[in-house]
Design a protein with these regions (language model features):
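Glycine-rich, Lys/Arg-enriched anion-binding loops that position phosphate/diphosphate groups
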Residues: 96-128, 140
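Anionic-ligand binding region
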Residues: 124-151
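General beta-strand structural signal in soluble alpha/beta enzymes
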Residues: 35-38, 53-58, 64, 86-88, ...
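Glycine-rich phosphate/adenosyl-contacting loop at the front of the ribokinase-like
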Residues: 250-283
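Active-site glycine-rich loop that binds ribose-phosphate moieties when present
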Residues: 36-39, 67-80, 84-105, 138-144
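Solvent-exposed alpha-helices and their adjacent loops that cap or buttress functional pockets
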Residues: 44-48, 53-55, 71, 76-81, ...
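A C-terminal functional module that forms or caps the active site or interfaces directly
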Residues: 149, 154-219
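Glycine-rich nucleotide/cofactor/substrate-binding loop typically near the N-terminus or early
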Residues: 1-29, 151-167, 172-174
C-alpha cells in the first residue's frame, strides 16, 4: 500500500525507524513515527485486515538465560493469539530453540516443517537437532492445514519452517561457529535485549566476510517462493468456497453403514440443585 517514494523514504531511515511490535503500534502511530514491524507487529496488522499468511526470514524466540531475564520475543505470544501463518526458516541458533518450541506448544501454536524431514530448521542450517510433530510436503498440504485452522476459528497462528536451500547449507558450520563467537562478543560488551540480534547478525556478517548475508538472502528468497506457492493454493481454496468455512462431513455410504441398530450408551452423571419454598408451617 506504499508508493515508491514512501518505500524509498522508509528504506533510508535506517536505525532511526522504530522496531515495532504489538506494544509499540499505538505509540508509533500516535506520534507519527516511522516503524519497521517485527513478526509480532506484522501479525497484528495482517489479522486486522484478513491476511492469513506472510513470509519472513526467521521468528524470534526464547533467549538463553530467559529463566533469569525473561527475555522472550513478543513474536511467540503473538503467534498464540493471532490466526496468521508465518512461513520462515525457523529460529536463529542464537536463541534457545528447544525452549522456543516448548513455548509455542504451550500457547497452542501449530508448528510444521516444509519437506520430508520433521527436524525444525535453525535459520542458517537446515538441522537444529529438534523435531516437530508435523511436516507438510507440498504447498497444497500446507494450505489445507492453514484452511482448517481458520475453519475451526482457532485464534492461534501457525509456523511453517522452511529449510535453507542445500546450495547454501554447506556454509552452516562456518556460520554457526561465527554465531557462537558473536554471542561471546555481545556478552563481553554487555549488549542485551532487542539490541542482541542486530549486533550478532552484523558481527557474524563481518566474521564470515559476507557469506552469512549471502545465505540470508538465499533463504529469504526461498521462503518467499514457498510462501507464495502456499498463498496461491490457499487462494484456490477460497475460490471454491472452502476457505475459512466449516466443511460438512460426507454421508456414510450404504455399503459402509452399520448393519444393525446401535443403541447409544451414555456414561456419566449430573448434579441438579432444587430450591423449594414451604407454604405451610407443618408439612
Amino acid at each position: 500500500g506504499l508508493t515508491r517514494s514512501e518505500l524509498e523514504y522508509i528504506s533510508k531511515m535506517g536505525k532511526s525507524a522504530i522496531k515495532t511490535s504489538r506494544r509499540d503500534l499505538s505509540a508509533v502511530l500516535s506520534k507519527g513515527l516511522v516503524g519497521g514491524t517485527t513478526v509480532s507487529g506484522t501479525m497484528v496488522a495482517s489479522a486486522m485486515v484478513g491476511i492469513p499468511i506472510f513470509v519472513t526470514g526467521g521468528i524470534g524466540g526464547v533467549h538463553y538465560g530467559a529463566e533469569r531475564t525473561f527475555d522472550v520475543s513478543a513474536d511467540l505470544s503473538e503467534l498464540g493469539r493471532s490466526p496468521v501463518a508465518v512461513v520462515c526458516a525457523g529460529v536463529k541458533s542464537i536463541l534457545d530453540i528447544g525452549l522456543t518450541l516448548e513455548y509455542l506448544e504451550t500457547h497452542g501454536v501449530t508448528v510444521a516443517t516444509f519437506g520430508d524431514s520433521l527436524e525444525f530448521p535453525a535459520f542458517f542450517t537446515p538441522n537444529s537437532g529438534f523435531k516437530v510433530p508435523y511436516n507438510v510436503k507440498t504447498p497444497e498440504e500446507a494450505a489445507t492445514m492453514i484452511d482448517y485452522n481458520l475453519q475451526m476459528g482457532l485464534k492461534s497462528g501457525m509456523v511453517i519452517g522452511v529449510p535453507i536451500p542445500e546450495s547454501h547449507a554447506v556454509l552452516g558450520t562456518q556460520i554457526e561457529a561465527a554465531i557462537q563467537q558473536a554471542l561471546q562478543d555481545a556478552k563481553s560488551k554487555r549488549i542485551s535485549g532487542k539490541e542482541v540480534t542486530p549486533f550478532v547478525l552484523q558481527r557474524v556478517n563481518q566474521l564470515t566476510k559476507g557469506k552469512s548475508l549471502e545465505a540470508n538472502i538465499a533463504l529469504i528468497q526461498n521462503n518467499a517462493l514457498v510462501g507464495s506457492q502456499i498463498a496461491l493454493e490457499l487462494s484456490k481454496l477460497r475460490e471454491i468456497g472452502t476457505y475459512g468455512k466449516p466443511q460438512t462431513i460426507p454421508n456414510i455410504s450404504e455399503e459402509h453403514a452399520p448393519k444393525t441398530k446401535i443403541q447409544p450408551v451414555v456414561i456419566g452423571g449430573s448434579n441438579v440443585d432444587f430450591t423449594a419454598k414451604a407454604n405451610f408451617e407443618i408439612m
